[in-house]
Amino acid sequence: MTDIINLINDFGQSNPERVAVRHKDEELTYQQLMDESSKLAHLLQDNHKPLIVYGHMSPYMLVGMIGAIKAGCGYVPIDTSVPSERVNMIINKVQPDIIFNTSDTQLNHSNIQELTIQSIQDSDNPTLFDSQMGLTDVVYTIFTSGSTGEPKGVQIEYASLIEFAEWMVSLNESEGSQEWLNQAPFSFDLSVMAIYPCLTSGGTLNLVDKEMINKPKLLNEMLVNTPINAWVSTPSFMEMCLLLPNLNESSYPSLNHFFFCGEILPHRTAKALLDRYPSAVVYNTYGPTEATVAVTGIKLTPEVIEAYNPLPVGVSRPNTSLFTTDEGELVIKGNSVSLGYLDNKEKTDAVFNFEDGLRIYHTGDKAIEKDGQWFIQGRIDFQIKLNGYRMELEEIETQLRQSEFVRETVVVPVYKNNKVIHLIGAVVPTEEVRDDLEMTRQIKSELKSRLPEYMIPRKFVWMKQLPLTSNGKLDRKQVAEDINA
């Protein structure tokens, strides 16, 4: 098991001028990344609480992450797209001493020191720092959706991250340094799939910002100017990019590796991609945030595409085993499993335990094993994935119920081809709805201050009451049937 910081540092010493990370016109070389992160680590060395790293796709967010690893305190990434109320929830849960803010907006939290890019650049701290991160230390905490209305902080230990990065590098069939594309914001653990395999193999990390997410033409300009080799994204992002007619092997021959995670990869998407890139290495992977990004993988070939629809997610990676309960729930066992949720013993005890000295996580996903391959069949609870983002419907409902216009509510996912395409909020209003559009606007306006955009229902339907089951519980299935009737 080779230390991540040592690998990055060794490459930086032999290739100091190679670009480590790039976003538009901003870039940092390996020398700059290691120097600036060491300067930050000196500022953090007496800090025993995680470093909040705040911003959006700034190369200096990598400085924050690497610096926090060197200092041994670990980091918590927060993207600027996260609503302020949710940011405050996370900060209150983490209780950090220091926030590294790479954005132009001050967070202004009393009793918390706020470092900026300028403060690191102006620092005269030494540019060398021996990493203090231990294998069993928490390297990062990523917050996911929580059913109580509060996000849950998933804690990943350093050894788990190292194993994951090594596994990802082993899947790469190219030799030498590569240009990697990262689509996911750093507060989404899919970004980990690009960051550390890229940097530990001497590659350049190219960051896709939120403007490109909905505008493939902007991404097209990026591909024209940068010979991307390895692509990491959700399947949904690839589906959108396939609308570009020139996304093919003849137009962009450098693209030779594709890694997908975060949601189910549709068969049609994989087939369309392989039709355009018949020589590429394409991996379909699966894993929850609680098990260090991905725990299974399969290389998709024309033979696999021909044999399976839906597609398998492959076999488990080293030091990780999978099994299912009698109810069909997938359980993950091994080194990849998280240490649990930050300061949330009740939630941790509900889904994590130990067996034979190894950590176990109950995923809530339905799965079967067939022909030696694992297949994911959806959720066993009310947690869903929309555009690659995992969320709990109960969290959205909790926030909806805070509205003065909402007496009761159920959020219903709308499916197409076994994939969630948007959400509908079934609402029992506190008063008669006289203007549908105005009521919808007011509720959405309230939600925007408390939830990310992707968690806000596309539309609302108004109901006099919500149906109950025979034992007095809310009948979600009936609500969904009523909406779709």
UniProtKB/Swiss-Prot annotation:
GO biological process: lipoteichoic acid biosynthetic process
Reaction catalyzed: holo-[D-alanyl-carrier protein] + D-alanine + ATP = D-alanyl-[D-alanyl-carrier protein] + AMP + diphosphate
Keyword Electron transport belongs to the record: no
One GO MF term attached to the UniProt entry: D-alanine [D-alanyl carrier protein] ligase activity
Keywords: ATP-binding, Cytoplasm, Ligase, Nucleotide-binding
Binding, D-alanine: D189, V293, K473
Pathway membership, UniProt: Cell wall biogenesis; lipoteichoic acid biosynthesis
Known EC number: 6.2.1.54
Record carries keyword ATP-binding: yes
An example Gene Ontology CC term for this record: cytoplasm
Subcellular location: Cytoplasm
Function summary: Catalyzes the first step in the D-alanylation of lipoteichoic acid (LTA), the activation of D-alanine and its transfer onto the D-alanyl carrier protein (Dcp) DltC. In an ATP-dependent two-step reaction, forms a high energy D-alanyl-AMP intermediate, followed by transfer of the D-alanyl residue as a thiol ester to the phosphopantheinyl prosthetic group of the Dcp. D-alanylation of LTA plays an important role in modulating the properties of the cell wall in Gram-positive bacteria, influencing the net charge of the cell wall.
Stated family: Belongs to the ATP-dependent AMP-binding enzyme family. DltA subfamily.
Protein name: D-alanine--D-alanyl carrier protein ligase
Organism: Staphylococcus haemolyticus (strain JCSC1435)
Gene: dltA
